[in-house]
């Protein structure tokens, strides 16, 4: 199951607002900008990369719809994330992010983590597999 957790609002005034989050991950991360209507993901991670087990991202602005399915499930589930929010995707969960609006997020992993631990399955192929079960 994908978990979406709103970030904690620390304070807000006429200048804007402040939020906090806690992470034990350090090093190189990905800053991603997505246009409304675009699709990302359509894959799952085996957990071979520590930074993909689980995959953690922070949605900084915008709204996204996440489609997800366990590898032995027969249903694709949907959850909506509205910034600011923390999104956690466990290993062996197929997932796809659709940007509802233009959005920005930080992935707490590197491109190398993605290359080493992403199994691509296009949504239409996943749906055919689920229908055959």
Where are the regions that the model predicts?
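A short, N-terminal "cap"/entry segment at the start of jelly-roll beta-barrel domains
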Residues: 1-31
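Conserved short histidine dyad/triad with adjacent acidic residue
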Residues: 11, 31-52
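Short beta-strand His + acidic residue motifs that chelate non-heme Fe in jelly-roll/DSBH
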Residues: 18, 66-67, 87-89, 95-100, ...
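Short histidine-centered beta-strand/loop micro-motifs
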Residues: 19-22, 41-51, 68, 77-79, ...
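Short, surface-exposed beta-strand-loop junctions and turns on beta-sheet-rich folds
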Residues: 48, 72-74, 112-113
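Glycine- and acidic-residue-biased ligand/ion/polar-headgroup-sensing regions
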Residues: 52-69
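Short acidic-glycine-tyrosine-enriched beta hairpin
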Residues: 70-91
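Double-stranded beta-helix
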Residues: 96-133
